[in-house]
């Protein structure tokens, strides 16, 4: 299910396609324990998950789990192993895990991915080609483009807000939209009536939770 591979990309944690995230987390812990003193605290690795799009919502929990075990994820790879050559990877794309802190005081550039298990606040822009994976809500004090996935731990109560919400994709829990907010108008995306709606900040009407 999980294994570490030494490749030209460096040390990669390869996670096969799976059905149960808890089983994956337990397998990671067991594999690291089995490897004894191979790792030192703070060692950096790459992460590749087969069927990446299916499991992208699990990345914050996996990254957080690895951090609790003393390992830092430096980049996320999208691709697969080469048949007959287990230590060779066919990498389709790679993104740098730029920050795991919840307050970011800079622009998030194309090719960078921010992963955090809670809320993420960005004082800057999120450029096209960038991605945020957040367990909670995402608030951008700037222009938000690229992909923003929120509520991956918190669920449908999470929101995505920006001074200019021009994202390529917004995901909140299991809901996805490619809609954008009104240009240059502070807006909030939230789940309402089992879909994501985007409303101006001064006109937002949240769905009441029971």
Curated annotation (Swiss-Prot):
Keywords of this entry: Cell cycle, Cell division, Septation
Gene3D superfamilies reported for this sequence: 2.160.20.70, Cell-division inhibitor MinC, N-terminal domain
Signal peptide, first to last residue: none
Biological processes annotated in GO: cell morphogenesis; division septum assembly; regulation of cell division; regulation of cell septum assembly
Disulfide cysteine pairs (residue numbers): none
Statement: the UniProt record of this protein carries the keyword Cytoplasm: no
InterPro entries, A to Z: CAP/MinC_C (IPR016098), MinC (IPR013033), MinC_C_sf (IPR036145), MinC_N (IPR007874), Septum_form_inhib_MinC_C (IPR005526)
Pfam family, one: MinC_N
Highest taxon of source: Bacteria
Self-association state and partner proteins as the record states: Interacts with MinD and FtsZ.
HAMAP family assigned to the protein according to its UniProt record, in alphabetical order: MinC (MF_00267)
Functional description taken from the UniProt entry: Cell division inhibitor that blocks the formation of polar Z ring septums. Rapidly oscillates between the poles of the cell to destabilize FtsZ filaments that have formed before they mature into polar Z rings. Prevents FtsZ polymerization.
Family assignment from sequence similarity: Belongs to the MinC family.
Protein's recorded name: Probable septum site-determining protein MinC
Organism: Thermotoga maritima (strain ATCC 43589 / DSM 3109 / JCM 10099 / NBRC 100826 / MSB8)
Gene that encodes the chain: minC
